[in-house]
């Protein structure tokens, strides 16, 4: 099976042309589309002038991990590009990807070791993009930082949630090695709440950052849910990533020779499609309850908002069928195993609700059904049992405008506090949280604060 990355670097001439299309707008809306506030016109201009070392410096000024976002970010900056009003936007993501790769190729990425230590210790719990960003910012600022991860390897979502064909793990490892050289300590295989209690961790460190993600999957409570062969998407992807890493997996979920149905049309669902196809699935069908998105931007989602449009990922290009307006009715099974999914057409009612249309039911054959329906908050009961940390109405870790929770010195960032979101938002929150931790411990900060905890994507509804 070929798990190699499918994304390729644009030809030098094409990159030069795309970077040159950037108009260096007086008000660059691409900044507003990016929660990191990336200096996009600046590094576009530098690429156009073949000054790649300076382009890398300007890119890393706002983004700890451009090699990650250049691969997995949906590029809301491109939706906000002024050129996109009447033509195709600049391919910002491709330029970002190329800068990141050339920087590593040319050995421009060097560890930044602080000249002096502050004398304060910080524990970061969770090693996804938010936790890693916070850890690197604080380590470079002179703090002694330890990152705890319950899995056997560091990386969180980047390690086991995203397939290699989108993000090869060698890309993650080379960045982690830079962080090790800077002084960040990694503690994989340690589950806070079990191996070390949360209250003991708080006593041990001057500050604690909760960056555990939003890992509780959304359920689908319809008849037949107890049948074997129905799995959460992340359970499938995590096992697949372990297999690609040549780990022993005692209970693999294998799509080989099976008719696979993926419920959910987002990035996680797309990753399931590509993974199932590589495993040799007999067929893959993706179902979404909503309408098929339009090809072009809808009037109610004007520029510079990121519109909901019909997208074709590399996984979709590889095969499978996509169905819309499909309401799930019942999991069908025999002898305790799933054999199909009963679906019906979806209707939108005048009151805004939606549901199945009577008389339109049919059964789709399925040996494996994957639930890629999103996530509903933090799954760690130990956190709230061992510390007086509050959860908000969506079961995310509640925090104030300084990212601090109800417990003094305990902060929360990324999906753990924001809820399910994008890698780019997680990095932005990790950077901002680090600034507030520094201010809390020293009374001042030199670190950037790209986003507030309550900030969201561009909203023109007000």
Where do the protein language model's features map onto the residues?
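N-terminal Rossmann-like FAD-binding beta1-loop-alpha1 element of flavoenzymes
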Residues: 121-146, 268-278
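A short, basic/flexible loop-to-alpha-helix module at the beginning of a structural domain
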Residues: 103-122, 238-258
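Ferredoxin-type iron-sulfur electron-transfer modules in oxidoreductases and energy-metabolism complexes
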Residues: 1-18, 39-71, 75, 86-116, ...
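A conserved FAD-binding loop/helix module that cradles the flavin
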Residues: 269-274, 279, 416-447
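Feature captures the FAD/FMN-dependent oxidoreductase FAD-binding
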Residues: 54, 116, 121-125, 173-222, ...
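Glycine-rich FAD pyrophosphate-binding loop
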Residues: 143-159, 284-294
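N-terminal Rossmann-like dinucleotide/flavin-binding domain of flavoprotein oxidoreductases
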Residues: 56-63, 74-76, 95, 158-206, ...
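FAD-site-proximal beta/loop scaffold in flavoenzymes
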Residues: 226-257, 349-420
């Amino acid at each position: 099976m070929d798990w190699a990355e499918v994304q390729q670097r644009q030809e030098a001439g094409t990159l030069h042309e795309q970077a040159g299309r950037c108009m260096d707008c007086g008000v660059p809306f691409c900044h507003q589309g990016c929660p990191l506030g990336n200096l996009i016109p600046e590094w576009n201009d530098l690429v156009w002038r073949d000054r790649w070392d300076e382009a890398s410096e300007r890119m890393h000024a706002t983004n700890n991990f451009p090699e990650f976002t250049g691969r997995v970010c949906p590029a809301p900056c491109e939706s906000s590009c002024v050129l996109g009003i009447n033509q195709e936007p600049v391919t910002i993501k491709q330029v970002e990807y190329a800068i990141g790769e050339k920087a590593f190729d040319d050995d421009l990425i060097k560890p930044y070791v602080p000249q002096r230590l502050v004398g304060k210790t910080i524990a970061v719990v969770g090693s996804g993009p938010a936790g890693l960003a916070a850890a690197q910012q604080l380590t470079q600022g002179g703090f002694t930082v330890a990152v705890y991860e319950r899995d056997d390897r560091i990386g969180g979502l980047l390690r086991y949630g995203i397939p290699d064909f989108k993000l090869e793990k060698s890309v993650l490892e080379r960045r982690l090695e830079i962080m090790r050289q800077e002084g960040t300590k990694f503690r994989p295989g340690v589950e806070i709440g079990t191996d070390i209690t949360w209250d003991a961790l708080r006593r041990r460190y001057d500050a604690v950052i909760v960056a555990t993600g939003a890992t509780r999957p959304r359920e689908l409570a319809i008849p037949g849910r107890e049948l074997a062969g129905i799995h959460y998407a992340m359970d499938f992807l995590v096992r697949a990533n372990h297999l690609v890493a040549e780990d022993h997996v005692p209970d693999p979920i294998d799509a080989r020779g099976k008719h696979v149905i993926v419920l959910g049309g987002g990035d996680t669902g797309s990753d399931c499609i590509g993974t199932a196809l590589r495993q040799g699935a007999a067929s893959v069908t993706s179902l979404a309850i909503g309408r098929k998105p339009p090809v072009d931007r809808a009037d109610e989602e004007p520029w510079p908002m990121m519109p909901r449009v019909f997208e074709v990922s590399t996984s979709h290009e590889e095969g499978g069928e996509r169905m819309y307006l499909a309401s799930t009715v019942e999991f069908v099974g025999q002898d305790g195993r799933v054999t199909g999914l009963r679906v019906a057409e979806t209707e939108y009612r005048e009151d805004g609700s939606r549901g199945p249309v009577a008389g339109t039911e049919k059964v789709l054959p399925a040996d494996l059904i994957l639930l890629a329906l999103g996530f509903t908050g933090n799954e760690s009961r130990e956190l709230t049992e061992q510390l007086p940390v509050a959860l908000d109405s969506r079961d995310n870790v509640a925090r104030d405008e300084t990212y601090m929770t109800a417990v003094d010195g305990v902060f929360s960032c990324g999906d753990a506090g924001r809820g399910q979101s994008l890698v780019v938002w997680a990095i932005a929150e990790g950077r901002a949280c680090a600034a507030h931790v520094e201010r809390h411990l020293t009374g001042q900060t030199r670190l950037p604060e790209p986003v507030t905890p309550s900030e969201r994507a561009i909203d023109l509804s007000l």
